[in-house]
Regions:
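Cap/insert and terminal regions of metallo-dependent hydrolase folds
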Residues: 185-187, 194-290
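Core dinuclear metal-dependent hydrolase active-site scaffold
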Residues: 9-79, 145-207, 291-294
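Bacterial N-terminal signal peptides
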Residues: 1-2
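Active-site metal-binding motif and surrounding structural segment of the metallo-beta-lactamase
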Residues: 54, 59-119, 212
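A short helix-to-beta-strand connector/capping loop
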Residues: 11, 114, 138-144, 157-160, ...
Length: 294
């Protein structure tokens, strides 16, 4: 599933994990607890959740989410290929801070980009067009919004197709979408945010079985993890997802890559006996730099 970064072994199309943390980042602002102290000086890289998709044949790369860490994420992504453009497109899931605010770095105060394609659903498009400073990016041609629609295929290269789909989430400013990323040989789901699997009009087990990789919302490990009513910030707990897949084969479980970890989530600990036991069941935990062939 994973492959070496030695150049001659690299496939032509692949996904790169560019971040695995919830919107607020790691360490979390204002957190003085052990969760944000004991691992802070480790060698682990924990950027806000994002994926890169690269096609070496067409010499193109795409970003999924424009996070506050976008500058460092694009620097890492661009190490894999050479192109005259910094990125060939950005796909946004929704209007929460960790998923779109990195667009600001395409503006005149930073890159001063020219017409970077930004793929957005209708409500997200309207949100960006109607609010400053985002509409300045459009007015100055720093970005070019490309409207996409539920379940409609988008061909981004000769070998790659993207399919957006909606998921239930706190849609204060925009709809929330996930993406299916389809390569010539393998495919992946990317669902960094959803309220609960039971609220979706699709069966998550069936959807995972239909792909090779599934990057799934794992914001919290279990109930009671934070000192606030967790129904205010609904997400499927990792323990809930594991329970849903408990009767599935290790091959199915191995498709799952948990992602989008809150700072309190023990999944951020690289050495933890509980996490190790879950890995032994077949599950994966997304780590910066992971690469998976398409």
């Amino acid at each position: 599933m994973f492959f070496s970064c030695v150049k001659h072994e690299m496939p032509n199309q692949f996904i790169t994990v560019l971040g695995n943390v919830q919107d607020a980042g790691y360490p979390h602002i204002g957190c003085k607890k052990n969760c944000c102290n004991k691992n802070f000086n480790s060698s682990a890289v924990n950027f806000v959740t994002s994926l890169g998709v690269t096609d070496l044949v067409d010499n193109k790369s795409f970003l999924f989410e424009a996070t506050p860490d976008i500058s460092k994420q694009l620097k890492f992504l661009n190490n894999n290929y050479s192109s005259s453009t910094i990125v060939d497109g950005v796909f946004i899931t929704h209007a929460h801070i960790g998923h779109y605010t990195g667009l600001m770095y395409f503006g005149r105060e930073a890159l001063g980009a020219h017409k970077v394609p930004v793929y957005v659903m209708p409500r997200m498009k309207q949100f960006l067009e109607s609010n400053s400073p985002w509409n300045q990016l459009i007015d100055l041609d720093n970005v070019q919004l490309r409207e996409i629609f539920k379940n409609k295929k988008i061909t981004i290269s000769k070998n790659l197709i993207i399919v957006p789909f909606t998921v239930p989430h706190r849609d204060e400013f925009s709809e929330t979408v996930g993406y299916k990323i389809i390569g010539p040989n393998k495919s992946a789901l990317f669902i960094p945010d959803i309220n609960k699997w039971s609220l979706w009009d699709k069966d998550i087990v069936a959807e995972v079985k239909d792909v090779d990789y599934a990057f799934l919302d794992a914001t919290f490990f279990k109930d009671g993890e934070v000192n606030r009513p967790m129904d205010e910030i609904p997400h499927p707990f990792i323990v809930e997802t594991i329970n849903l897949f408990k009767n599935e084969s290790i091959q199915v479980k191995n498709k799952i890559h948990f992602i989008h970890f809150n700072h309190t989530n023990i999944s951020l600990q690289y050495k933890n006996p509980v996490i190790d036991s879950i890995r032994k069941l077949g599950y994966n935990f997304a780590r910066f730099g992971d690469q998976l062939s398409l």
